[in-house]
Each structure stands twice: as C-alpha cells, then as structure tokens.
C-alpha cells in the first residue's frame, strides 16, 4: 500500500505496546513512534482513544485501532500479503491462538503486577498464581519451539513482552523463573534471538529501575 501513514502511540515499558512494535517489525512496516507521557496524555491520544485513554494506539491513515491484541490482528489482516503470517491459516488453530492470547491478558498481567505492588501473604499468593500460570503456558508450548509450532507468531507476540518485566517480578517476588519454568525461559531466549523482539523489548534492568520508581511513588519502598 502506497502513501500510508502509520503512527504508534506508546510508552516504552508497556508490554502491550511491545506487541505492536514486534508485529510491525515482523511485517517490516515503517511507522512513526510517539512516546506518551501517561501523567500528561497528549491531545492526540485523548482524541484517538477517548474511551479508555490508554496506550498503545495504532493509527493507520488517521484511523485509530485500540487494544493491543486487536491491533496485532489488524496488522495481520491489512498486511496479510507481507510475510510472515502472524496468525495460523487454519480456523481452529487461529481460535486456539486467540484463546491463549486472551488467557495471557486475563491472568498473567494481574499476577505479575501483584508481585511488585503487594507484600506478605498477598504477594506469596500472587507468586504461586504467577508460577502456576507460567506452567500452564509451558504445557501449551509443549516441545514446540514456538506456541504456534515451528514459526514465531501470534501467541509468542502476545506473551514475549512480559519477559522484559521478569527481572522485576523475580526481584520483588523472590523467585527464579528459570528454576521454576526452564522451558518457558528457553522459549523466551529463543524469541529474543529474533531482531523484531530484541529491538522492541527494553532491557530487563531498565524495567526494574522503572518499577523501583513506581514502588516509591506507591509508598512500597
């Protein structure tokens, strides 16, 4: 498509924004990245996402696509002729991919957040839930290199952004993902070898420092 305008409104530590960065990189779509200050949201963000007022927002030729998973599907549908395919071609496999992306959003984010926003028994419960969630995902991965099989795709894109937060999760939750879920870590390292992922995810220590600042603001330090 010629003369296209693609803009991404994002915030660097957002695992949801990372999904769009990866998907756009996989499809080799050129876009303008606009970093948002979430304490002082831009008029463009408020105009493009008036309902939730959240990032990320993909803007394609002036039209906004909100919610990261929906936007990844949009990228696949609009640029379906550009390799690679991010979603499976088989309807059942596509439904399964959407199921696991939904599971990730409904479970992993909240459990991960509680690891650094809570203490004591509540934090211990969150750690247990978080590790159990990873083990469920390990089961879905099985012995495949990626969740969709031999090819990096939709579920991998939905999940890998969380990996940039794992140093923070482990630091405040006091556990080792590699000890608990070695297959998950092996998958994450495999994904990190892809240029689209490596260039889209911030360094784990940088995210840890960001979380430390948030904890101070929340009065947890």
Curated annotation (Swiss-Prot):
Its EC number is 2.5.1.18. This is Probable glutathione S-transferase. Root tip-specific expression. Glutathione binds at residues 14, 41, 55, 67-68. Coiled coil: none annotated. It catalyses: RX + glutathione = an S-substituted glutathione + a halide anion + H(+). Transmembrane segments: none annotated. PROSITE patterns: GST_CTER, GST_NTER. Residues 4-83 form the GST N-terminal domain. Belongs to the GST superfamily. HSP26 family. GO terms for cellular component: cytoplasm. The keyword Magnesium does not apply.
